Regions:
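Conserved short alpha-helical segments that host acidic/polar catalytic motifs at enzyme active sites
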Residues: 1-136
C-alpha cells in the first residue's frame, strides 16, 4: 500500500482497525466518522455508549476522517456503506425484496431498479451494513 490516494488511506485505516485492532464495522464507523464532542455529551447516547465514544475519540483521534468521503466497502460476507459525518458526500440506500442497493445518487439505483420497496439517505456517519444471505 503506497497511500497515494484517499481510497488507499481509508482502506488501510479500516484494515488496521478491523484486522489488527479486532474492531467490528459498527465501531470502525464510530472512529472514522465519529460524532462531534457536543453530540457525544448530549442525551442522545447512554452513559456506556458515551464512554465508548470518548474512548474511541481519544485513542484513535488520528484516524478520524475529517474531509468529505463516501465509501462502499466489501468484506467477506457483505458490504458496508459510510459517508462523512457532515454528509458532504451523498449516499443513498434502497431495498427491493431481499436486494439492497447502495449508490452515491438515487438515479443510479433507479437505473437498475426503477421501483423499490424503500429508499433513504443515511445520516452522515451512519453505517449501512449488509450481510449476504442473512434473513431479517
Amino acid at each position: 500500500c503506497n497511500l497515494l490516494t484517499d481510497t488507499e488511506v481509508i482502506t488501510y485505516i479500516i484494515d488496521f482497525l478491523n484486522r489488527k485492532q479486532k474492531l467490528c464495522l459498527e465501531d470502525i464507523a464510530k472512529i472514522i466518522a465519529a460524532p462531534f464532542w457536543s453530540e457525544i455529551d448530549s442525551d442522545k447516547y447512554s452513559e456506556s455508549e458515551r464512554q465508548k465514544l470518548k474512548y474511541f475519540r481519544n485513542v484513535f483521534s488520528s484516524l478520524l476522517i475529517t474531509g468529505p468521503f463516501s465509501i462502499i466497502l466489501g468484506f467477506d460476507g457483505g458490504l458496508m456503506a459510510l459517508n462523512d459525518r457532515l454528509k458532504l458526500r451523498s449516499m443513498v440506500a434502497a431495498e427491493k425484496g431481499d436486494m439492497v442497493y447502495l449508490a452515491s445518487e438515487e438515479c443510479a439505483i433507479r437505473a437498475i431498479c426503477p421501483v423499490v420497496d424503500r429508499i433513504w439517505s443515511p445520516r452522515g456517519g451512519e453505517p449501512i451494513i449488509v450481510k449476504l444471505n442473512e434473513k431479517k
